[in-house]
Each structure stands twice: as structure tokens, then as C-alpha cells.
A protein has these predicted regions:
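Left-handed beta-helix
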Residues: 34, 40, 45-46, 51-52, ...
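Terminal amphipathic alpha-helical/low-complexity segments used for targeting or macromolecular assembly
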Residues: 1-36, 134-135, 141
Length: 141
């Protein structure tokens, strides 16, 4: 289990136990230590890892990330101007460096989002998407 995941679990525990001030203090420390913004109310599944301690990652508080995902540095997940809803990431997903996942988007299980991809639409299970806007490159076998 990597450091940022443990840090987030502490923030999340404080938040769910209505210790919001302490959760926000820990969040502020995490921004300084890890140069990442992972809000305490965010749901992150067990086994998810952030290599490079999520350096430069920014997430909206209501984004949901499934189990056993790998999220590389510089990833942004959040809202999209003029659209309602936020990203939901399935299980066993790899999100490449500096990818952006924006709006009411679901990333399917066992999928890969390539480095620098801009995801604006749902991604099915078991595929690799790349580009701006992200398009299916191939199946992920």
C-alpha cells in the first residue's frame, strides 16, 4: 500500500467520523507533502495505487475510483463545464500520466486510459483508449 493511499484513508476516516476540521488539516498537509489534491470524502477502492505518490493529481471530491486501479502522476478527474455528473472509475483500471477524465464519464473495468488522453465519454470494459478526445485503440486482453 503506498503512502498517499494510507494518507487518504486517514483523511477519509476522519471525514466519515464527522471530524471534518481534522480531515481538512490532513488534506492541506497532503497537498504540501504530495503536491496532490485527493479530497477526504472521495471513495477509493482497496488495492488502488498511486505510483509517484499521486504527484500533481487533482480530483473532485465526488469522483469514485474502484478497486485495484493504478493512477499515474498528473491525472485530473472532475467536472466538465455545462455538463452534470462526475467520473466513476471501474475496477482494475490503469490511468496514464496526465490523462484528464471530465464530466459524467464511466471508465469500464479492466480498461486502460493512455497517457495524455482526454476522456469525455464513457469507456467500455476491457479496452484501451488514447488521444484527444479519447478513442478506442484496441481491446485490452
Amino acid at each position: 500500500m503506498d503512502r498517499i493511499f494510507v494518507w487518504h484513508k486517514m483523511e477519509h476516516w476522519l471525514y466519515t467520523h464527522k471530524l471534518n476540521l481534522l480531515a481538512q488539516i490532513l488534506r492541506g498537509g497532503g497537498k504540501i507533502i504530495f503536491a496532490a489534491d485527493i479530497p477526504p470524502q472521495m471513495e477509493i477502492g482497496e488495492g488502488t495505487v498511486f505510483p509517484h505518490d499521486a504527484l500533481g493529481c487533482i480530483f473532485h471530491p465526488d469522483v469514485k475510483i474502484g478497486k485495484n486501479c493504478k493512477i499515474l502522476h498528473g491525472v485530473t478527474m472532475g467536472g466538465r463545464a455545462g455538463h452534470k455528473g462526475l467520473p466513476v472509475i471501474g475496477d482494475n483500471v490503469l490511468i496514464g500520466t496526465h490523462a484528464q477524465i471530465l464530466g459524467n464519464v464511466r471508465i469500464g473495468n479492466n480498461s486502460i486510459v493512455g497517457a495524455g488522453a482526454i476522456v469525455l465519454h464513457d469507456v467500455p470494459d476491457n479496452v484501451v483508449v488514447v488521444g484527444n478526445p479519447a478513442k478506442i485503440l484496441r481491446e485490452n486482453k
